[in-house]
Each structure stands twice: as C-alpha cells, then as structure tokens.
UniProtKB/Swiss-Prot annotation:
<dbReference type="Pfam" id="PF08085">
    <property type="entry name" value="Entericidin"/>
</dbReference>
<keyword id="KW-0472">Membrane</keyword>
<dbReference type="GO" id="GO:0016020">
    <property type="term" value="C:membrane"/>
</dbReference>
<comment type="function">
    <text>Acts as antidote to the effect of entericidin B.</text>
</comment>
<feature type="lipid moiety-binding region" description="S-diacylglycerol cysteine">
    <location>
        <position position="19"/>
    </location>
</feature>
<dbReference type="GO" id="GO:0005886">
    <property type="term" value="C:plasma membrane"/>
</dbReference>
<feature type="signal peptide">
    <location>
        <begin position="1"/>
        <end position="18"/>
    </location>
</feature>
<dbReference type="InterPro" id="IPR012556">
    <property type="entry name" value="Entericidin"/>
</dbReference>
<feature type="lipid moiety-binding region" description="N-palmitoyl cysteine">
    <location>
        <position position="19"/>
    </location>
</feature>
<dbReference type="GO" id="GO:0009636">
    <property type="term" value="P:response to toxic substance"/>
</dbReference>
<comment type="similarity">
    <text>Belongs to the EcnA/EcnB lipoprotein family.</text>
</comment>
<keyword id="KW-0732">Signal</keyword>
<keyword id="KW-0449">Lipoprotein</keyword>
<keyword id="KW-1003">Cell membrane</keyword>
<keyword id="KW-0564">Palmitate</keyword>
<protein>
    <recommendedName>
        <fullName>Entericidin A</fullName>
    </recommendedName>
</protein>
Amino acid sequence: MMKRLIVLVLLASTLLTGCNTARGFGEDIKHLGNSISRAAS
C-alpha cells in the first residue's frame, strides 16, 4: 500500500513538472519570436 502511494505521488509530481516546463518553453519561444520581430523592423 505504501509503495503504491509513493509511486502515485512521484508520477503526479513528474506530470505536473512536465506541464510547467512545457509552458515555460512555450513562453521562451514566444519571447524569442518577439525579439526577432523587433530586430527585423
């Protein structure tokens, strides 16, 4: 029972971390695109 709970908590934390990382990566790409647009104009 305890092993199952630990695995569940680790899995949940991994999924949540992955979502935050993907969102941060998307924002970085957006900022990069804005910088390129400003440099081009």
